[in-house]
C-alpha cells in the first residue's frame, strides 16, 4: 500500500504553500502548523508528516529548528524534515530532537560522497530530495540550475543506503494539476531505491494511480488542506 505523507511548509513559523517553488507565490494555509499536525495525526493512513523549512532551503542552513522541535512534541507520528540541512551536526541535532528522518537536497546532490557517508552513518533515515524541471535537476531552493540529468544522476545512487528519493516535478508543484505520472513511472523503473512522489497531487485517484506505478509514498501539499481529499480515509 502506498504511504501518505502530508506536508507542512514553513516560512517564519507560518504554514504556507508555494507554486512552482517561487517564493513570491507564497500563500498562507488555512490551518496553522499546529492545527495541521493535530488534523493529520487523527488518520491511521498517515504514515508520517513531511515538514520543510523553506527559508532554510533558500538560505542554505536550517532556520526553523526550534519551532520544528516544538511541533515534534505534538504528535506520535513519524516526522521527516528538510530544508537547509547541509551538515552532519544539523542532522544529529534533528535526530536528538526526536525527528525520525532527515531530507537532504542540494548538499547531497552536489557532494555524493558526503551523502554516502551520511547514509551509512544513519542507514534508512536519510532521504534525498531531487527536484527537477522536466529532467533537469535544480538546487538551492529550486533557484539554481545544474547540468545534472534526473535519470543519469539517480542511477548513480544505487549503492547508497538512503531511505528513498523524494522526487518533485517543479512544474507541477503547488498547482494541483496532477503529478507527472510519466516521469515518475520512469523514475521508479530506473532505480531500486524507493521513490516518493511530490507535486501536483489533487485527490485519491492520483494516489491510486501513483500506487499502480509502484511509488512508495506520496507527499500531499495543498490537497491535504481540503476536506474532500480525506473523505472515506481513516
From Swiss-Prot:
InterPro entries, per the entry: Aldolase_TIM, His_biosynth, HisA_bact_arch, Isoase_HisA-like, Isoase_HisA-like_bact, RibuloseP-bd_barrel
Q: What class of enzyme is it?
A: isomerase
Q: Which pathway does UniProt place it in? A: Amino-acid biosynthesis; L-histidine biosynthesis; L-histidine from 5-phospho-alpha-D-ribose 1-diphosphate: step 4/9
> CDD domains per the record?
HisA (cd04732)
- Identify the GO cellular component terms for this protein: cytoplasm
The record's family statement is: Belongs to the HisA/HisF family.
Name the residues annotated as catalytic in the UniProt entry.
9, 131
Q: What is its EC number?
A: 5.3.1.16
The protein in question is named 1-(5-phosphoribosyl)-5-[(5-phosphoribosylamino)methylideneamino] imidazole-4-carboxamide isomerase
Q: Example GO molecular function term?
A: 1-(5-phosphoribosyl)-5-[(5-phosphoribosylamino)methylideneamino]imidazole-4-carboxamide isomerase activity
Q: Where in the cell is it found?
A: Cytoplasm
Kindly indicate whether the keyword Plastid belongs to this entry.
Answer: no
What HAMAP family does the record tag this protein with? HisA
Native organism is Staphylococcus aureus (strain MRSA252)
Domain of life the protein comes from: Bacteria
Biological process GO annotation list? L-histidine biosynthetic process; L-tryptophan biosynthetic process
Give the reaction(s) catalysed: 1-(5-phospho-beta-D-ribosyl)-5-[(5-phospho-beta-D-ribosylamino)methylideneamino]imidazole-4-carboxamide = 5-[(5-phospho-1-deoxy-D-ribulos-1-ylimino)methylamino]-1-(5-phospho-beta-D-ribosyl)imidazole-4-carboxamide
Keywords attached to this entry:
Amino-acid biosynthesis, Cytoplasm, Histidine biosynthesis, Isomerase
Amino acid at each position: 500500500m502506498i504511504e501518505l505523507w502530508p506536508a507542512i511548509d514553513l516560512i517564519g513559523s507560518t504554514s504556507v504553500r508555494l507554486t512552482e517553488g517561487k517564493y513570491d507565490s507564497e500563500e498562507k494555509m488555512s490551518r496553522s502548523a499546529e492545527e495541521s499536525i493535530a488534523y493529520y495525526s487523527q488518520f491511521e493512513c498517515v504514515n508520517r508528516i513531511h515538514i520543510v523549512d523553506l527559508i532554510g532551503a533558500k538560505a542554505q542552513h536550517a532556520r526553523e529548528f526550534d519551532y520544528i522541535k516544538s511541533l515534534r512534541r505534538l504528535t506520535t507520528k513519524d516526522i521527516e524534515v528538510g530544508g537547509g540541512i547541509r551538515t552532519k551536526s544539523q542532522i544529529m541535532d534533528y535526530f536528538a530532537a526526536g525527528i525520525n528522518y532527515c531530507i537532504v537536497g542540494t548538499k547531497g546532490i552536489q557532494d555524493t560522497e558526503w551523502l554516502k557517508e551520511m547514509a551509512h552513518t544513519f542507514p534508512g533515515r536519510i532521504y534525498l530530495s531531487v527536484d527537477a524541471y522536466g529532467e533537469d535537476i535544480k538546487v538551492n531552493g529550486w533557484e539554481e540550475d545544474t547540468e545534472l540529468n534526473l535519470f543519469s544522476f539517480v542511477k548513480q545512487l544505487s549503492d547508497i543506503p538512503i531511505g528513498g528519493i523524494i522526487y518533485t516535478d517543479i512544474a507541477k508543484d503547488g498547482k494541483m494539476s496532477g503529478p507527472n505520472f510519466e516521469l515518475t513511472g520512469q523514475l521508479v523503473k530506473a532505480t531500486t531505491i524507493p521513490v516518493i512522489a511530490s507535486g501536483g497531487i489533487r485527490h485519491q485517484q492520483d494516489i491510486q494511480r501513483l500506487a499502480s506505478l509502484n511509488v512508495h509514498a506520496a507527499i500531499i501539499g495543498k490537497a491535504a488542506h481540503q476536506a474532500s481529499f480525506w473523505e472515506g480515509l481513516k
